[in-house]
Amino acid sequence: MNAAFIANMERILWLYALPLDPKFPVVCFDERPCFLIGDTIAPIPMEIGKVAKENYAYEKNGSCALLAAIEPLTGKRVAQVHGQRTKKEYTIFMQELAKQYPEATKIRLVQDNLNTHNTSSFYENLSADEAFELAQRFEFFYTPRSASWLNMIEIEFSALSKHCLNRRIPTQELLEKEILTIVKSDRRSGTR
């Protein structure tokens, strides 16, 4: 732990301590890989008093990327599943995130230092005017290196892992459907 680590950590903790302000919402963003795994033999369904049984053999169907954000003080969530994780997908997600906060002056975005997590991604994928306009919607707060645990979206990823990412899901379409169902149902019920 050095001075830069402590400085970034304290900046994030200061941000989390701020009261709710719709003009300056605090939103935590990250992405994670998801592996698409199918069954080679159909699982044996559950019976009363018995657990479902699945064969140890499985089929690899590639991977995809889950991009997600959460506003910790309200529980508002946004999620997208993409075939890959590049500057293009980051830009698409940030455009959607900005649309979710039309009244915000600036979205205070907590994220890690990944090479795609900066405004240059916008300029590589949008016109200069659109990129500038999108960049003005955000104020970036970077977690210290090796400190993703400071980003509250990690808690959401843990919850998603327990709900649906802890089992075999064979296609990107099915994964997206399941994740968006959970995100939308949590939003309606106020579950966190």
Annotate each language-model stretch with its function.
Residues 1-59:
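Charge-mixed, compositionally biased segments that are often intrinsically disordered regulatory tracts
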Residues 23-24, 104-106:
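Short coil/turn segments at beta-strand junctions that form active-site/ligand-binding loops
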Residues 28-30, 69, 75, 94, ...:
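Mobile genetic element proteins and their domesticated derivatives, centered on retroelements
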Residues 105-118:
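Acidic/histidine-rich, metal-coordinating catalytic segments
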Residues 120-131:
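Short, aromatic/basic amphipathic alpha-helical patches
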Residues 146, 154-192:
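C-terminal anion-handling pockets and recognition modules
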